């Protein structure tokens, strides 16, 4: 996706009023898959690369593509020296170019899309996963009252979020899956209605992080889904990777040892040390079921849009094909003893 030249000129003018000066001779380069919030590489007059992130063009669903939300989160995290890009300027007046946008620092490093890290040696694989766990624990350890974010501090995020996803996909009786429905109704009664709140990333995974040359997590990207909620949301989304077979989405499965990766138990221990709290295994088991149902609903949503002929990501077919495997993992995990959920 290209950035319209007239829009770019308006952006340059706006940023100059914010004391941010763009190199007009460097054409914006589209980066990322462009399916969510269009993202461009730009350069300032001191020859430093920066990132411009905008809302998509056209009508947007209420509450979707909140780049202003991302900006405020990055601003709060920058004050904590957290591993995330520093934001510089936000334009929340959509009348300027028809949509909101902001600029943040460009973080150089590697983005890994294969969770098995085939190009890394054993030591580096451990460093990368340990760093991911520590950074996630650090995020969840922050006092949300000190972050000054305009987010609601309501308890019961997991119940609300799961109900939202489930109802969105299975509102039509003819499309309901009896096996999924049984698990959904059961787990909904097990999810917490209250408890501690943390700042959640909402989509914390390997390919949403930038890894430095010393194999540390240098920056966490894509904060569009961030909110206040139970930290179990983010940590369970990581732990299920050891339950999902390798080759299916972000799965590590039973190949973790063969590929020299740390275990889920290792990851959880590193996370707990950084978070400075122990995670209850029964609660984590329930959270893993939550994450698997939610992931299944996301995949079914992609399938629905695909069959309706609506625009979806380039890897839509791959994600659609993954749905049966995720359902199988979900059903097996639901019947598994909580202590066996944590692969070690």
Residue locations for each model-derived region?
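Juxta-kinase regulatory segment immediately upstream of eukaryotic protein kinase catalytic domains
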Residues: 1-22
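ATP-binding pocket architecture of kinase catalytic cores
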Residues: 29-182, 190-198, 214
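Catalytic-loop of the protein kinase fold
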Residues: 199-201, 206
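Helical subdomain adjoining the active site within ATP-dependent kinase catalytic cores
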Residues: 280-283, 294-344
């Amino acid at each position: 996706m290209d950035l319209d030249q007239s829009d770019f000129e308006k952006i340059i003018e706006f940023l100059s009023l914010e004391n941010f000066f763009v190199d007009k001779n460097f054409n914006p380069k589209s980066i990322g898959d462009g399916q969510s919030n269009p993202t461009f590489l730009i350069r300032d007059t001191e020859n430093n690369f920066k990132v411009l992130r905008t809302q998509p063009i056209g009508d947007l669903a209420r509450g979707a593509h909140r780049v202003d939300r991302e900006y405020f989160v990055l601003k709060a995290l920058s004050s904590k020296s957290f591993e995330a890009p520093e934001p510089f300027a936000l334009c929340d007046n959509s009348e300027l170019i028809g949509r909101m946008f902001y600029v943040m620092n460009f973080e150089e490093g590697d983005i890994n899309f294969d969770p098995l890290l085939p190009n890394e040696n054993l030591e580096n694989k451990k460093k990368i996963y340990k760093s991911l766990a520590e950074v996630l624990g650090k995020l969840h350890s922050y006092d949300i009252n000190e972050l000054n974010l305009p987010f609601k501090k309501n308890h019961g995020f997991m119940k609300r979020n799961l109900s939202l996803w489930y109802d969105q996909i299975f509102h039509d009786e003819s499309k309901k899956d009896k096996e999924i429905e049984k698990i959904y109704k059961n787990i909904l009664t097990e999810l917490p209605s209250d408890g501690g709140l943390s700042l959640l990333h909402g989509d914390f995974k390997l390919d949403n992080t930038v890894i430095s040359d010393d194999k540390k997590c240098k920056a966490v990207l894509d904060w569009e889904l961030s909110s206040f909620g139970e930290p179990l949301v983010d940590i369970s989304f990581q732990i299920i990777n050891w339950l999902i077979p390798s080759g299916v989405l972000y799965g590590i499965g039973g190949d973790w040892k063969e590929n020299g990766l740390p275990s889920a138990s290792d990851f959880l221990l590193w996370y707990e040390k950084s978070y400075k709290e122990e995670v209850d295994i029964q609660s984590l088991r329930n959270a893993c079921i939550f994450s698997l149902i939610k992931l299944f609903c996301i995949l079914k949503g992609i399938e629905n849009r695909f069959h309706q002929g609506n625009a979806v990501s380039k890897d839509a077919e791959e994600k659609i094909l993954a749905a049966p495997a995720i359902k199988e993992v979900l059903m097996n995990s639901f019947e598994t003893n909580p202590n066996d959920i944590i692969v070690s």
